[in-house]
Amino acid sequence: MNEMAGKAYGLAVRLDLRGALERTALQSALSAVVERHEALRTGLRQIDGTLTQVVVPGVTVSLPVVDLGGRGPDPAQLDREVRRLARQEAQRGWNLAQPPLLRGLLARLADDHHVLLLCVHHAVCDGLSLQIVLRELLENYTGGGPAGADEPLQFADYVVWNNGGEEFPDPEWSARRQAAREHWSSTLAGAPQVLDLPTDRRRPPLQSYAGARVPVRLDTAFADRVRDWSAQRGVTPFTTLLAAYTVVLARNGGADDLLVGLPVANRSHADLAGTVGYLANTCPLRADLRADPTLGELVRDLYDRLTGVLEHADLPFGELVELLAPPRMPERNPVFQVMFGLQQDVRRGWDLPGLRVDVEDVDCGNARVDLSLFLFEEADGAIDGFLEYASALFDRATAERFADQLHTVLRQILRDARIPVSAVDLVGNGSATTIDSFLDGGPLEQPWPLVWPRIRELAARRPSAEAVRDDAEALDYASLVDRVDAAAARLTAAGAGPGDRVAVLAERGVRAVVAMLACWRAGGVYVPVDPAAPLPRRELILEQAAPAVLVCEDPDEQPPHHRSRAVAIGDLTAEADAGAGTPAEPAPRPHDPAYLMFTSGSTGRPKGVAVSHANLSSFLHALTGRLALGPADRLLALTTTAFDISLLELLGPLVTGGTVVVAPSSAQRGAADLAARLSSPGITTAQATPAVWRLALSAGWRPREGFTLLCGGEALPPDLADLLAATPAEAHNLYGPTETTIWSCAARIRPGEPVTIGRPIPGTRVLVADAALRPVPPGVCGELLVGGPGVALGYLDDPARTAARFVPDPYHPGERLYRTGDVVRLRSDGLIEFVGRVDEQVKVRGHRIELGEIESALRALPGVRDAAATVLDPRGNARIAGYLVADDGALDTAGRAARLRQDLSEALPASMVPSELYAVPAIPLNPNGKVDRRALPGTGRRLEGGSERVAPSTDAEHAVAALWCELLSLPEVGVREDFFGLGGHSLLAADLLQRLERDLGARVPVAEFFMEPTVARLAATVSQLSGAVHQTPTQDPDGRAEQTAEPSPEDRGADGDGWDFPTVRRSVTVPGSDPVPLEVSP
């Protein structure tokens, strides 16, 4: 574990002592408490490979004094200094082998004002035990001693009894323990053990345990309303508050089934009332929201479930982990990542003779899980507490937002508990003001004419300016208009009338541009078809589009089943015939369809999206204005015409007086050719997908000053964003589905800034909403909905799909929103962060997987030029595969795969490290320039170190493998197989590391094992450590085992504590008995 892990399992309290303090009496009182309770004289030591609790007699506790009296009379300054000192003392590491695991510090502020700071480790003390310590400390100080001063039941006795020891026979123990196991197995069957709350930073590979708190308070009046409401419904305030917290968690985490950890005192036996030790347990309570209960139903369900939790709360958390065998998660707490607690406030004061004592919690600056809500019922009826959050994951503003949402949900419970959980308003504004939740790109300055009239208007002003060119020819604006007029006349003669569809199946170039414009000049609908697409796809598109005319390279070689009249593009786009007149120009209405763009459908059949002339004109007006395109610009067109973003390339320059330079389709496939074309004289702008830009950069291309670089079509990887931002170009990340007309949002790519899709373009508005189209708060993941003039007409001949995706805008009557199916979140700075797809949430072993994050880590590996990732067998034995394009020889060295996996383990959570790696010559791209993930499986050379079995070869490997086989109950294991992938879990890992030390003399740090849990890595470590000295246990005078050797750093807390108290198996040694395992929870 890391250093913070040892610090995270500490408790600290501050006692303000006002009056005449007798320091000697206080020291004696504290020593008496330590002497009375064995747990406070207990240390943790390795004995015969087992981490054992050792009770040591004659332990003394010191009470050093710090004099702050000279810091000045300012009370606020003194209080700040005390809080700084308290935090410092609470975060100081522990030597777990050397009791007492309790320490004190006395700060003198004035002769009549002292502050006592007490810190104790969770290994020997829980929250109720700390209350006992405080009470007895003050009773001892007054000279009376603990009330009812009989010898308390010691913690070691409790452990023996709780584990079914013979010294304290309990005939019902076995039956009770079995019933608990059956209860938890049944209750938690199928429950997700990961709650993915939206975080402000990427989760580190190892849980950091660093934390902070924000206050949560319900004043007396509000708290009384909660109590009254709960009493009327026969439930407790605990359940009502828990329900509100659950709703906040579920709605923020996008979960309908989650586990919340509940601390349980676990002191049902009367004899345990005065016992000091770690008796508490933390039990998961399952909140099942899959049926979308009302708030009232949720409260009742949680109340009923609490009964089962409390009845079976004595099953130790470690045994529960062993029972559930959750996936390896060194980056987060197992089973649950959120906690809740409510108790009577023990932070009260005492009036002693001559001394007033006030007690206050100390914020230790840690967080054992992602998020914890701990509340206390105060004497005046108010409910006060804090929300503790993992500061490695969340900003304070995010935690404050969670706290505000808790109040919002509570008010809705009290106001109307008939509201379904899915309908709860986290924003708290109510539907009347949800229009403010839209992010608006601002108005368009003035309406534009439709595209063809706009081009004709510019041609009249700049007839000799170059309009379009390819490798074979170039046309100025006047020639372009003449060609389009002639082509439109031929289309009309071929049977294409106003409103008819015209399919253009041709290579990119000047002729394709003329054919496209001729469709509109003739009043028709443009339907681009990629000639490089497979024949079955081309046939499906033509079948659905049913064009009146098919424009193609050679009518005799086209799909045999189409019924359209075929026209050769060479004939169509030739110069006008001598004497040919100009045909009448139809006047399409703004809302008539301009083009039909086919995209991939979930059923395997392409779906056609109909986009109007007004959609297209508004988009071009908005984005060309945003990019400030003008007559001086020359845009290199790289994209296939069957991808809607090509329309920006072909039309953006033509509606602003610039020039389109059309590259052949081969330009995207050859890095050198691509780089050369981008570097051509005069090219000022280009648009491409991330994969194509990476290809250009790999060939050494660098944009010149003033170059405008447009990137979109798929998620922009952060590493590529950094590369683009480092160039002199003005780089933009663009986002938009075909259904909202090409691009809807844009963001400047700047050095050092996170990747976002920015804000809407002018005229567009977007909403981040839940499934019921209610706005979600900033930071919360939701579906992106797009409104405005870019929202397309709908899907061709598919009214049901159109109605499902193009929905009425509930906040702008008469308008529509398009449901993109993309998951985003609105950041606090107003920028939109793309998260993933609603319908393509990839999960592997219970974890949500972001392939883009994995790919960024793969590309950061030494010698790797490009990479992609995919999930193999997502419905069966799901596993992540990484595909690497590397420098020559970079992946050929022996052990390279293992080193790559180690590097990945340091950059990614364990759940995201690919289990298989492949070397490939290039990442496959589809015709649109996007990564073709479907083409990845089955390609490339498998790198050794994946899941194929490699037998042990060295003595150390054979020894380690034998231990694995024994613990995992397997006949054999390979040296590169993953311990956790074979069924191991954290408790077995603890057993394994103890056996390695006992049998092989190697003390392996837990963190090192978790980074690469393979036989090969362990064997190498064992070989290095096998010379370590074995420690021999001896006996204390009272018969308790003790070590004579000085504890090693691994036994120490801040000095390298290797043990995580929620999951490690520990033992208590008592006179005349063998070590008894003890499971410890958070």
From Swiss-Prot:
Keywords per UniProt: Antibiotic biosynthesis, Ligase, Phosphopantetheine, Phosphoprotein
Entry EC no(s): 6.2.1.66
CDD domains per the UniProt record, alphabetical: A_NRPS_Ta1_like, LCL_NRPS-like
Catalytic activity: holo-[peptidyl-carrier protein] + glycine + ATP = glycyl-[peptidyl-carrier protein] + AMP + diphosphate
Span of domain Carrier: 951-1026
Enzyme class: ligase
O-(pantetheine 4'-phosphoryl)serine sites (modified residues): S986
Signal peptide annotation: none
Disruption outcome: Inactivation of the gene completely abolishes the ability to produce SFM-A.
Comp. bias regions, Basic and acidic residues: 1037-1055
Gene Ontology terms: cellular component: cytosol; enterobactin synthetase complex
GO terms under biological process: amino acid activation for nonribosomal peptide biosynthetic process; enterobactin biosynthetic process; lipid biosynthetic process
Obligatory cofactor(s): pantetheine 4'-phosphate
Region listing for Disordered, in residue ranges: 1027-1082
GO molecular function, one term: 2,3-dihydroxybenzoate-serine ligase activity
Cystines in this chain: none
Pathway: Antibiotic biosynthesis
Family: Belongs to the ATP-dependent AMP-binding enzyme family.
Function: Involved in the biosynthesis of saframycin A (SFM-A), a potent antitumor antibiotic that belongs to the tetrahydroisoquinoline family. Specifically adenylates glycine and loads it onto its peptidyl carrier domain, via a thioester linkage to the phosphopanthetheine moiety.
Name this polypeptide is given: Nonribosomal peptide synthase SfmB
